[in-house]
A protein has these predicted regions:
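Generic enzyme active-site microenvironment
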Residues: 67, 111, 140
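Conserved active-site-proximal phosphate/metal-binding subdomains
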Residues: 85-86, 90-104, 115-200
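A short, small-residue-rich loop immediately preceding and capping a beta-strand
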Residues: 106-112
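Active-site entrance/lid segments in N-terminal catalytic domains of soluble metabolic enzymes
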Residues: 1-102
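Conserved acidic functional residues
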Residues: 48, 112-113
Length: 200
């Protein structure tokens, strides 16, 4: 879900999501109150957090599940590269979360460029101090999932989308507004989008 979308769109999307009784929700650009509303319906919800200040604010507001998604991700991209973001956020969590009971309730998912054994090992290394503190850690490997058989078989994406991703060897960042950019395959659509943006 896009937490920064217009209120009616968020409401409508949330109602559709609830009708499918998902086990998990990822909320990009969301707020703790949005996560709490889904959690009240039994949907485990994670908030994307692109900066240490937001992480601290969200912890103070009672949020406990976060996605730390660096700029190397597909889809919506944040302002910081993965390693810079992850290092900063791990330091913030270690400085903020001192109580073991609180630590045990916090879940962190690392995302943005995690695609093979080496990148997963890098996450394991940077996340080790959090795990030692009792914070639960994991990874989102969205790009790896994009290339799987299951993503098409389950209807999460259509084969044409996957084929475009498989054929892609370069990407572009399409900015739809201040602070809102998405990574996309270099394509006629991306070329038209960028040309129109230049015209405006």
């Amino acid at each position: 879900l896009l937490g920064f979308a217009p209120a009616k769109l968020i409401h409508d999307q949330t109602e559709v999501a609830r009708s499918h009784a998902p086990r998990f929700a990822l909320i990009a650009g969301g707020r703790p109150d949005q996560a709490r509303a889904l959690e009240a319906d039994g949907v485990t919800s994670y908030l994307h957090v692109p900066s240490p200040r937001l992480l601290t604010m969200f912890l103070e507001q009672g949020a406990t599940r976060f996605v730390l998604e660096g700029r190397e991700c597909g889809g919506h991209v944040g302002p910081l590269s993965s390693f810079v973001l992850w290092d900063t956020m791990v330091s913030t969590l270690l400085a903020t979360v001192k109580d073991s009971a609180q630590a045990g309730g916090i879940h962190i998912l690392f995302a943005g460029g995690v695609h093979d054994a080496l990148s997963a090992a890098m996450v394991a290394t940077i996340a080790a101090p959090l795990a030692e503190r009792g914070i639960k850690v994991g990874v989102l490997a969205g790009t790896a999932y994009l290339f799987s058989k299951e993503i098409v078989d389950t209807g999460a994406v259509v084969r044409g989308f996957q084929n475009a991703a498989l054929a892609c060897d370069t990407t572009v960042t399409l900015e739809t507004g201040p602070g809102h950019a998405s990574r996309a395959a270099t394509s006629p659509f991306a070329d038209a989008f960028l040309a129109r943006r230049r015209e405006l």
